[in-house]
Regions:
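Gly/Pro/Ser/Thr-rich low-complexity, intrinsically disordered segments predominantly at protein N-termini
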Residues: 1-185
Length: 185
């Protein structure tokens, strides 16, 4: 008789208890995906440079209009807390003090992909669509392309657009246009 192997799924609360107990460290590069603790890829220079460019661009142009969050957790549901490379949140004067980040407050989620493109296109895209994130970007550092996903419906994004380094993309919710040559350098 075959016995099915069961995995223990961790909730977001379990995940934080593991950190408080010292089993995982707040400095560990991990995230909670489908109840599993997933080790993230190490930083590399092209990835870091692109994140820094995006951060500078958004922070300088969107002060008072949006909150720029760099590599901090985003609680999507009870079993998923990824750590996107960058999130733009609706502006609030209190910066959501005392609250976990929630998908309904996010305007844009960005993953910068240098070595994780398949994962970002698959698992992450599905998670963000199911959570109702209005706009998701995958910044493909290697090929200097931006994949833009919008209109989350029934667990998937209805619209996909591929943009090149010479293109611009408008964030309609913020009335702001990003020149991709500034992102890719």
């Amino acid at each position: 008789m075959a016995v099915a192997v069961k995995k223990k799924k961790f909730t977001v609360d379990d995940y934080y208890l593991l950190a408080e107990a010292g089993i995982i460290s707040y400095d560990d590069r991990v995230e909670l995906i489908h109840g599993e603790i997933i080790e993230m890829s190490p930083h590399n220079p092209p990835h870091s440079v692109c994140i820094n460019r995006l951060n500078m661009l958004f922070a300088s142009q969107l002060a008072g209009k949006a909150i720029v969050s760099v590599q901090l957790s985003l609680t999507l549901d009870n079993y998923n807390e990824p750590e996107p490379d960058l999130v733009l949140y609706k502006h609030r004067d209190d910066f959501y003090k005392g609250e976990k980040s929630k998908p309904e407050n996010a305007l844009l989620v960005i993953e910068v992909a240098n070595t994780t493109i398949k994962y970002d296109r698959g698992v992450k895209r599905e998670l963000y669509a199911k959570a109702g994130i209005p706009e998701y970007w995958i910044v493909d550092v290697k090929n200097q392309l931006l994949e833009r996903y919008t209109v989350p419906e029934k667990g998937q994004f209805e619209q996909k657009e591929i943009l090149e380094k010479e293109d611009s993309v408008k964030l309609s919710q913020l009335n702001f246009t990003v020149e991709l040559k500034k992102v890719f350098g």
